[in-house]
Every structure is written in C-alpha cells, then in structure tokens.
Amino acid sequence: MRMINLRPDKFHIQDDNKNLYEVFNHNTTIDWKNAKILDFGCNIGNFLISAQDYIKLENYTGIDLNLNSIKMAKKKFPEANFIFYDKWHISYNPPGTKDLKASDILEEKYDVILAYSVFTHCTVSETQDILNDLLGLLNPNGQILFTVLSDKEFHGFYNWICTHNKQYNVPKLNVDDIEYENVVYWIDYDNIIIDKDDVDMNECSGFCVFYKLQNFNKVIPNAKFLGVPPKDYGSSFQTLYCLK
C-alpha cells in the first residue's frame, strides 16, 4: 500500500463557489420556495450560497458534525437554522458520540433532505444506516437528494491528487494497479484500500469512497439515479441520487 500523507481536517471546512442549488435541482421538480429543507452535512452552509434566493431561509436547517463549520455557518446565514451534530467521526469529530442518529436531535419532518458528498466519507454500512434514519425524517412525499463519487471519475480525482503532490507530499499513484470489478473502492488518506468493508476504520485517518454506478443499487436498492450534474456547477466527481 502506498502512503498518502494528507490531513483530513484540512479538507472539511470549505467555502467554495459550487452551485449546489443547481446540483440538487438537476432532474428534479421541487417547490423549493415552500419546501422545508434539511441539509445533512451542511458544512458552512454552502448550499445557501447559491440557493438563498430560491428558498426561505427560515425553512432551512443545516446540521454538521464539525463544530467550527456550524459556528461559521451561523455567522454567514443568521436567518437560517444550524445545529451541531455531535456524532463521532474518525476524521471530523473524534470526541463525538458514537451511534448518535440525526433523528435523536431533530424533532421536525422535512420535505427535502440534502446530503452533498456526505457518503464520500462513510462506510457502506454507515451510508445504509444514515439513509434509513433520514427516511424517517421525511414528510409524506418527501425525498432525499444525495451525491456519491463514481468510479468513472476516479481517474479525474487521481489527477487532482497528483496536482497536489508538491503541496501535500502525495506520492504518485498507479491507477492501473487498482482493479475495477468490485462494488466499492476505499481511498484512504494513509493507505489505499480496495473493497474492504471489514477494515477497521478506527485505524484510518480519513478516506473517500467510490461507487460503481451499475452496482450502487446493491448498496441502496431503492435509490433512483438522477444523473451527473454538469461540471460547470462545480460538482466534479459527483453523481446525484434520489431516495423516497
């Protein structure tokens, strides 16, 4: 396994120009203006940068397990609702509470639940558990919109990593060494792990997960593929799914 010395905490708080409103509006018909929205893994409220003119801020709730992200979000968008989700995560909130569900801290129901690049950093079982929990927070006819990384984009992500070699001392990876017959790919910041759902993630400092499009429904059988949002929305490497 090749060593990749990245600091995962450096990658979480992001204030970027992604048009997340258009990402989640891709191939959907949502009454955004009247929708009650939960942004699961909201970071610093990045969805609102492009969406604030299309939604009512008082109908928006963002939760994140990074306390600093929540503090920044509250300053940026004081009219919206932000809640610190004190759940354990090996990279982003090691002191947090294990097995803390979103439904444990939220009492309301929502028309739309968003999760941008959340499951990029979750094991398969975590993804399944989280989505099952979030389904219980939906109003009738509500839906969850979420993105995952596609294995088809791995080469692009690999190139992105290599462009950061100088800054982060990342050794060049040999993509050809990775076999593509498996459902899931683990890209760990310390090691490369291929299709190892039984790996003790407590030993990993951080990771990314890539899914094969044709096999993702083995993981989430009822998820509907909504396509790949245009890259000019700033959503490189992401594919969009809907779950009701």
Predicted regions and their residues:
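A short glycine-rich, Lys/Arg-flanked "PGG" loop and its adjoining helix->strand segment in the class I
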Residues: 128-140
